[in-house]
Amino acid sequence: MKLPIYLDYSATTPADPRVAAKMMQYLTQDGTFGNPASRSHRFGWQAEEAVDVARNQIAELVGADPREIVFTSGATEANNLAIKGAASFYREKGRHIVTCATEHKAVLDTCAQLEHEGFSVTYLTPQSDGSLTLRQVESALRDDTVLVTIMHVNNEIGVVQDIASIGELCRARGIIFHVDATQSVGKLPVDLGQLPVDLMSFSAHKIYGPKGIGALYVCRRPHIRLEAQIHGGGHERGMRSGTLPVHQIVGMGEAYRIAKETMADDMTRIGALRRRLWQGINRIEAVSVNGSLEHGAANILNVCFHYVDGESLVMALKDLAVSTGSACTSASMEPSYVLRAIGLSDELAHSSIRFSLGRLTSEEEIDYAIQLLQKSITRLREHSPAWRAFKAGSE
């Protein structure tokens, strides 16, 4: 067993060796290095064919038509293109957007930018487990609502939103529905042939693909239109200009192909490991789950260790790679806005740690993590006046 143990798979994953090997075939002179937009020679034709294969692999995992897949530089850009693109194109229809206070910053900051441009945004406060009810969403809709954007799986607490019901509601009202599926695709079944979703954002590096590449699903039936946010060449059917990075696209396609084959077995095994981790942690006094074990994704466990400062705990757990929030905000000393949105105090939010498990996580690593947590928390609480007061009050 190698130390430190990586338990931060929701931040990023290592590229699968098969993905890396595939990508190398599209980088050097000995490989397929051409520009897929160069249609006058074989180098371009081969590159275009590789892109088409990858586009099909991605579409197959999510039950989409390959023509509905638009490549971007990552899920952040896909979210920007979906939200800004739809809002701009349909602005004459309405200028009201509905989202959730626990969305990723890639969605929240994009919505905030649209507020500066004259749009009105309603930020729904989730229930204590992080979920939204259909009634909450329905009550927020207005005559001028043009877009609803709700993530499928929350990156910090793992709660799974009922995107099927929300999508049906939006479809009935003629409102565009966007889903950030960065944390769900390749981990939960997604069938866009059945789901009433208009736009869906994907990433590669969350499921053992390369960083710097993502995609946006843009529904053809009903036909969804977007205003391009990047101009210069009209690539990707005019929705996203820029030379396609063939090696990254091929890597994403290979990662999605592998995920389609292994997802069911992976998540059964990872779910068992998460239960094992929680059973061990739950033997520690004064701990609680943030979110829901029952309605959460199998790979994420967010735990509050009462009477322990989270930053001190992370430092004490130098042999564990874990986080106190999302990777995009982990440098901030502010408590997690997601945990505050579900009702935790700043103190409890600061005392919380996210564990996210992956394809390479082993039972041995989980057992080591449990032992280290038990020892570290006992040691840290020995120096905690709040813990001593709690113990004195409970005796």
UniProtKB/Swiss-Prot annotation:
Keywords: 2Fe-2S, Cytoplasm, Iron, Iron-sulfur, Metal-binding, Pyridoxal phosphate, Transferase. It catalyses: (sulfur carrier)-H + L-cysteine = (sulfur carrier)-SH + L-alanine. It is found in: Cytoplasm. Coiled coil: none annotated. Its EC number is 2.8.1.7. It is an enzyme of class 2 (transferase). The modification N6-(pyridoxal phosphate)lysine is found at K206. Pyridoxal 5'-phosphate binds at A75, T76, N155, Q183, S203, A204, H205, T243. Pathway: Cofactor biosynthesis; iron-sulfur cluster biosynthesis. One of its GO terms (biological process) is [2Fe-2S] cluster assembly. GO terms for molecular function: 2 iron, 2 sulfur cluster binding; cysteine desulfurase activity; metal ion binding; pyridoxal phosphate binding. PROSITE patterns: AA_TRANSFER_CLASS_5. GO terms for cellular component: L-cysteine desulfurase complex. Pfam families: Aminotran_5 (PF00266). [2Fe-2S] cluster binds at C328. The active site is at C328. Master enzyme that delivers sulfur to a number of partners involved in Fe-S cluster assembly, tRNA modification or cofactor biosynthesis. Catalyzes the removal of elemental sulfur atoms from cysteine to produce alanine. Functions as a sulfur delivery protein for Fe-S cluster synthesis onto IscU, an Fe-S scaffold assembly protein, as well as other S acceptor proteins. PANTHER family: CYSTEINE DESULFURASE, CYSTEINE DESULFURYLASE FAMILY MEMBER. Homodimer. Forms a heterotetramer with IscU, interacts with other sulfur acceptors. This is Cysteine desulfurase IscS. The lineage of its organism: Bacteria, Pseudomonadati, Pseudomonadota, Gammaproteobacteria, Enterobacterales. The gene is iscS.
